[in-house]
Structure formats: structure tokens, C-alpha cells
Amino acid sequence: MATTLGSGERWTQAYIDAIRRNKYPEDKRPDSHDPCGCCNCMKAQKEKKSENEWNQTRQGEGNATYTEEQLRGVQRIKKCRNYYDILGVSHNASDEELKKAYKKLALKFHPDKNCAPGATEAFKAIGNAFAVLSNPDKRLRYDEYGDEQVTFTVPRARSYHYYKDFEADISPEELFNVFFGGHFPSGNIHMFSNVTDDSQYYRRRHRHERTQTHKREEDKSQTPYSAFVQLLPVLVIVTISVITQLLAANPPYSLFYKSTLGYTISRETQNLQVPYFVDKNFDKAYRGASLRDLEKTIEKDYIDYIQTSCWKEKQQKSELTNLAGLYRDERLRQKAESLKLENCAKLSKLIGLRRAG
């Protein structure tokens, strides 16, 4: 029994020593959890790893030596009130000037080379300043809403505010490796707020996507209406044209018999004996001078019509003659010769009557 108790005491003492050395060796830490693979969990795991790296670096700072110049440099960074002062550039600095300033300061304040108190926070501030100012959109927002506050605190407390809503999604070490590891990106570094705002960012993005989808659906539903609006001017013009034709007064005569319009009574002009047709009310409306003027108009219209018909007859006769000669077709030649130019004969008669009159 004594031997068993001694073994239990030794086991208990070993367990206590393990807890002191490692803290929670068998169970997981209270604030840890298995990442589920979602964006927020992966982000939290990444930042926890980054915080552990900063803690190890800060522990090394207390045991290393530093120069007075390095300490003054850290103090200068802490006193800066905006990102331009941190990098030591003007507000209209170009991308090349920003890169040059960052490279110089990053090498100077990297924790491996600068062990002054606060060098880690200064290095992080330098990286965050460059990451913001190198992005055109973030820089524009920073110039408009910046100059609020710059607070250097312990990363573990998660209250470092290198300008609210202007924290980089890339760590200072990753940014440093980008520059000095031979993999400088061709584009700008994209920025987001801290991890606590990621859910808000994705909610805003999904809300924006839903809004765009709803807008597209509205556009689809409005497509027939939009098409109708576009065709409306054409419809108005056609409608006006039809109404105008319907409301326009019918001419008092016709060169041809048209029972549907009432032109069933045959007449002839007094001068050239041109036939035309009128309705039953014609005699009441036209007498004397008005009738003579109207008949002049009728004769002119009739001559124009006969001239057009004569030209068509000559054109047809000429085409048949040419085809007969081209194909040496006797049948076409005979048809061309037998074709009578009746309207041309009428035209000649009318011209003779006009000359005689």
C-alpha cells in the first residue's frame, strides 16, 4: 500500500511539473478551438500564430542590447501622428518613394536588427503604414478620414489602432519577406479591417450581392415595359399618319372606276376628253370656274399617268428585243414585234389635242 501511494505521489508531482512547464499539456487551452475551415476561424488561427511570434520576439528584446540611435528611432515612430510621418514622406509621395522609405525603415527596425524597447511595435507600424498608403483606395480613404489616432499597445491585448479601420491583412513579417524575399507583387497590397470586422465585411458583401441580384431581377421585369417605351415614338408617328389619312378629305375625282369610294359616275374633260369618275355629289360642288380648274388638274394627272405607262411599254419592248438578239430566240423576237404601245399612242393623241387647242 505504501509503495502504491508513493507511485501516486510521484505521478501527481510529475503532472504538476508538466502543467507548470507547458500549461494545459493534455487538454486544449480554454480559448482555443478547432478551426472549422471558415474564413473567421482561419483568420483567428493566423492572428493567434502571429501574436505568439510577436510575444517570442518581445521576450528576446529584453535580453538583447541596443544603441541610443535605435531607441530614438523607436521613440520617433511612437510620436508620429499619421502614416506619412511614420514613413517620413510627403503627402503626395509616389509609389517609388513609398517603397524606398519602407525598405529603409523596415531594415532599420526589424526585430532581428533592432532590439530597442518598442521596436516590434514600430516595425509593425511601418509595415501597416506602407500597406495602407500603397493601396490607392485605402490611401484615398485614409487621406479623407485619417488623422484620428495612433496607439501602440501590446498585440496580445488586441487594441493596437494604427488608424481605425486601416489595419493590414498582411503581417509585417510577411510584408518584409515580400520585399526582401525576391517576390515583390506586381499589384497593390489589399487591406481590410481587423478580424472582428471580417464578419461585417462579408455581410456587407453578401448584402451588396443580394441588392445587385434584386436589381437585375427588376431590370428583367422591366424589360417589356422598356421595350414598349422605346417603341412608343414609332407607334405615335404611325398612329398620327393613319389618322391623318383617314381624316383627309377624299379627292373629288378618280381616273379609274372605284365603287368602294363612290367614284362610279363617268365624265370627260371638255378640252382633251380625258375620262374620269366622280361621285353622285360632284355636280353640286363643282360648276363653272371651279369645274374648269379641276379638269385642268385631271388632264395633267392623266398625262403624267400615260407618260409613265408609255415609258414602261417601251422598256418592256426593248428588253424583249435585246433578249431575242442575245439568245437568238425567234419566239422572243416575234413577241417583241407584236407588242403594241397603246399608252404611247394615247400620249401622242393627247399631245396633238393640246397643240390644236
Curated annotation (Swiss-Prot):
Record carries keyword Ubl conjugation: no
Annotated J domain residues: 82-146
Protein's cellular compartments: Endoplasmic reticulum membrane
Signal peptide start-end: none
Keyword Membrane appears in the UniProt entry: yes
Keywords: Chaperone, Endoplasmic reticulum, Membrane, Transmembrane, Transmembrane helix
UniProt superkingdom: Eukaryota
Transmembrane segments: 227-247
InterPro entries per the UniProt record, alphabetical: DnaJ_domain (IPR001623), DnaJ_domain_CS (IPR018253), DnaJ_subfamily_B/C (IPR051100), DUF1977_DnaJ-like (IPR015399), J_dom_sf (IPR036869)
Main location: endoplasmic reticulum
Pfam families documented for this protein: DnaJ (PF00226), DUF1977 (PF09320)
One CC-aspect GO term: endoplasmic reticulum membrane
Membrane topology, record value: Single-pass membrane protein
Protein name from the UniProt record: DnaJ homolog subfamily C member 18
